[in-house]
Amino acid sequence: MEAVDRATLALVIDHTLLTPEATSADIVALCAEADELSVGAVCVSPNWVSLAHNNTRIPIASVVGFPSGSHLSATKAAEATQAVSDGASEIDMVANLGWIASGEWSNVENEVAAVRQAIGASVVLKVILETGLWSSEQIIAACKHSVSGGADYVKTSTGFHKTGGASLDAVRMMRKTVGADIGVKASGGIRTTAD
């Protein structure tokens, strides 16, 4: 594997704090660290988007339907719209895991499309799939329907599910499925450059 320098690596990292007990002081500190490290984005819960936006020059990402994915589609769309209004330029949406489990692919695709329509084309939309739960066939189908719905990226994990985070096999499968024009984001369980 080719070595990547620290500055290049930083640009693909979302400096993230999504714990429910995070405080405003924690968010301000996260933003200061993000500025110092020159990361690609600061990712916070929807209630902290405005504060983060006012405390860093780094792009802001926020989550919707987090962490379970079981929110109503209209709720996810409204949550995403509010986050964008508050300053987010990236949305990380958790797919409805029950629909993936039961193969309700049109529902998966329609929900992604609803969030895409709500936020517009200029906002980056990442769809989190919790790949540790699924067979290869389910991962492939979830990727295809997320992209058909308007996702800019597919993402491995919330990092909150008991199945763990990213796996190299899942990332490879996702990349092969979506091709070079759609992003693949490995998340969850990645703590070191070796990971």
Identify what each model region corresponds to.
Residues E2-L37, A41-V42, N47-V184, R191-D195:
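Alpha/beta enzyme core
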